[in-house]
């Protein structure tokens, strides 16, 4: 399995936008070694698609729903704040979380 870096973000979130270039770099450098970044956008499809294309995001982006906010809270982010990053080990288990800019 791969190591997963799951980043919950939104286009309207300044710290989210600030950390995306670093996530692009992680995917570029560590992707070949089995690291997969996945962005979960809490936003509209149109805004997400446009932003991802403009900045050149090189990793998978999926759209979250209101259930995503519940998931974030279950993972320890009680405020539901963004950005929020979850690290998954090669077995798919949560090995760490980080709230805020990385």
Task: Please describe what each predicted stretch is.
Residues 14-15, 21-25, 60, 83, ...:
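Proline-centered helix-kink/hinge sites
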Residues 5-6, 37, 85:
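Hydrophobic beta-strand anchors of alpha/beta hydrolase catalytic cores
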Residues 53-58, 64-102:
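Thiol/disulfide oxidoreductase modules built on the thioredoxin-like
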Residues 8-9, 40-43, 64-65, 101:
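Active-site-proximal beta-strand/loop segments in catalytic clefts of secreted hydrolases
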Residues 17-56, 66-73:
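Structural microenvironment flanking redox-active thiols in thiol-disulfide oxidoreductases
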Residues 1-14, 23:
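Short active-site neighborhood of thiol/selenol oxidoreductases, capturing the structured segment around
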Residues 8-12, 51, 58-59:
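Conserved hydrophobic/aromatic "anchor" residues
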């Amino acid at each position: 399995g791969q190591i997963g870096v799951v980043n919950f973000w939104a286009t309207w979130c300044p710290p989210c936008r600030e950390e995306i270039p670093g996530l692009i770099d992680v995917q570029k450098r560590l992707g070949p070694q089995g690291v997969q970044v996945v962005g979960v956008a809490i936003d509209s499809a149109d805004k997400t698609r446009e932003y991802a294309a403009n900045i050149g995001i090189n990793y998978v982006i999926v759209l979250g729903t209101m259930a995503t906010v519940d998931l974030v809270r279950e993972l320890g982010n009680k405020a539901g704040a963004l950005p929020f990053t979850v690290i998954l080990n090669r077995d798919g288990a949560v090995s760490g979380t980080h709230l805020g800019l990385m």
